[in-house]
Amino acid sequence: MPRRSRYDDDEERLPEGMTRVGYDADTGVYTFQDSDGSYWEGASGSRYGQLTRVGHELAGEDDDAQPFLPSNAHAGPKVSWRHELMPLLNFGVIIGVALLLLWWYLHVAAGPDKGSAQDCPSGTKPYTIHQGDTCWDIAESHSVGVDDILTLNPELDCDKLSIGSQICLKD
């Protein structure tokens, strides 16, 4: 890449009809002359940028006292702080939805306690499963067969007995 760009020339950077006529090394200010003969100065330390008119008396209707190039401060409407924080709001909504989904998942995973209120038919009684119980041990302790337990509890899986759940047994 060359050291000089084609946009470093005055004719590319300055408004039409403007020429650079001087430079004050003490203040670092460039002076320019317009096609109508008026003089303009740039900002201190800036080669190009906002130009202000100098060296003449202002007439009542003359609005040349305004900067030649508009500044960026007046370029657009003032942006609200709410508009500036909009990406943060989007992030907050994403976090909120994630927490809501987590709460829903934990609520569903916990589920209702299926064995706490077992309704057993007449002639049977509920039995709460304790740690270490097996279908065989329950059948032996209540003098019934394993087939009788499975008949009264069709959804029972003897390999997966849940501690605290209830099953129905004959009296």
Curated annotation (Swiss-Prot):
The LysM (lysin motif) domains are small globular domains involved in binding chitin in eukaryotes. Blys4 contains one5 LysM domain. The keyword Transferase does not apply. Keywords: Virulence. CDD domains: LysM. Disruption phenotype: Does not affect virulence to host insects. This is Secreted LysM effector Blys4. Residues 125-169 form the LysM domain. Induction: Expressed during in vivo infection of insect hosts.
